[in-house]
């Protein structure tokens, strides 16, 4: 996973949320949205699922900011599903699994940053999603920050594989 790109036809593209500022995606989130739109234009999925809640003081959820982006790019409202409560990857993907079950979505393509892909895929499997991944081509997170994120993700994957990602999520939130 990581820098791999497993893109192939699926039922839905799932865009994992990231920071947004008053409805405007952060550069990291924008890279995810742009990549998902590129995949959408390749006709790889019928639906887009946008994820992410909001932090204290926010007026908009990450999912609402993502929906607005896709609507301005011509994706029809009825083809976008919103998961707007999750504040963690685990919570968002657990909610996506419920949406997928309700909407008869069998296979999803998860879009996130390269360093985040393996953990996202493993969490998706734990919550019952049939998932493949497609990472953004590059991350706006570079240098020391990228190194730190990769270490955090590696630790998260290791611990999650041992005790389960649900337990890790409950410890950290």
Give short role names for the model-derived ranges.
Residues 2-151:
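A structural signal for short, hydrophobic/glycine-enriched beta-strand patches
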